[in-house]
């Protein structure tokens, strides 16, 4: 089996693949203070809950945008499974071209999202990933990563609003039923979610206007909050919640791993 781990600023997502099939997955809080032993214990526990043993893991692959966590988690994977994980970054030999000015600065999650899109859809695609940041990443049908846009994520914006104002309450993010909020929590939901949806639509239209070949790219969404925003955004055509993990699986194959 393949153990695939994507370390993001807020959450770490772990997936277990049998062949090309994602058999199980789970989310952990990204905690830089965790020791390799603690990470190893956590991974072992989650594998057991999934009905799997660490001995069934034949290959492992890690992507990270949190350098302080990367080494410890890689050590944890090797301790738990005896398998040294491959690590994906801008130097990895993958079947896409990072056609940008600073390829080594492109986040691993952005690389994986566009790799998955290129391999799955074989068409020009914009991937909108709703994470700690909301990213818009552009990949052509022939696998050229063109760059993209990065804006504050939904929870990042919401948390900043709450922290920066004395009287606004913390509010659960739920779909707003109207734009004009009759209560403060309604007004916050409308501002954060409808504001994000309209920002997505506006930025996607701007990206389409700059697209090099004049074709209309496919627009897909991924990330933990994609299903919340997608119904509110006119430009999003489909949601693929496990796109980054799929990218890790594709990267593992491209790097010669077997499982």
Model regions and ranges:
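Short Gly/Thr/Asp-enriched flexible loops that form oxyanion-binding sites at enzyme active sites
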Residues: 71-78, 137-146, 232
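ATP-binding/phosphotransfer module of carbohydrate and carboxylate kinases, centering on a glycine-rich
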Residues: 2-4, 158-259
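Short glycine-aspartate micro-motif
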Residues: 2-6, 61, 125-129, 220
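Phosphate/pyrophosphate-binding loops at sites that engage ATP/ADP/AMP, CoA/4′-phosphopantetheine
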Residues: 43-59, 203-215
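Phosphate-binding/catalytic loop of phosphoryl-transfer enzymes
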Residues: 83-87, 92-164, 193-208, 228, ...
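Short glycine-rich, Thr/Ser-proximal phosphate-binding strand/loop in the N-terminal lobe
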Residues: 2-48, 143-169, 174-178
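A short helix->loop->beta-strand "cap" motif at the edges of active sites that frequently abuts
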Residues: 81-84, 217
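Phosphate-bearing ligand-interacting subdomains
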Residues: 47-78
């Amino acid at each position: 089996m393949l153990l695939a781990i994507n370390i993001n600023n807020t959450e770490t997502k772990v997936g277990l693949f049998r062949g090309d099939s994602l058999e199980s997955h789970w989310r952990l809080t990204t905690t830089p203070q965790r020791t390799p032993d603690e990470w190893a214990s956590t991974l072992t526990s989650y594998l057991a809950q999934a009905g799997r043993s660490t001995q069934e893991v034949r290959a492992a692959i890690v992507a990270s945008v949190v350098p302080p966590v990367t080494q410890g988690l890689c050590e944890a994977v090797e301790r738990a499974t005896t398998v040294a994980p491959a690590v994906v970054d801008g130097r990895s030999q993958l079947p896409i071209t990072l056609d940008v000015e600073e390829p080594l600065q492109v986040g691993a999650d952005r690389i994986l999202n566009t790799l998955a899109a290129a391999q799955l859809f074989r068409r020009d695609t914009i991937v909108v990933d709703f994470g700690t940041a909301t990213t818009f990443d552009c990949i052509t049908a022939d696998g050229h990563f063109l760059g993209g846009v990065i804006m504050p994520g939904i929870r990042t914006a919401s948390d900043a609003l709450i922290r920066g104002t004395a009287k606004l309450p913390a509010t659960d993010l739920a779909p707003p039923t109207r734009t004009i909020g009759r209560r403060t929590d309604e007004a916050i939901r409308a501002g954060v979610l409808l504001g994000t949806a309209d920002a997505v639509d506006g930025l996607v239209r701007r990206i389409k206007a700059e697209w090099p070949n004049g074709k209309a790219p496919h627009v897909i969404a991924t990330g933990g909050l994609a299903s919340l925003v997608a119904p509110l955004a006119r430009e999003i055509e489909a949601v693929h919640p496990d796109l980054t993990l799929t990218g890790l699986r594709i990267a593992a194959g491209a790097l010669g791993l077997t499982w």
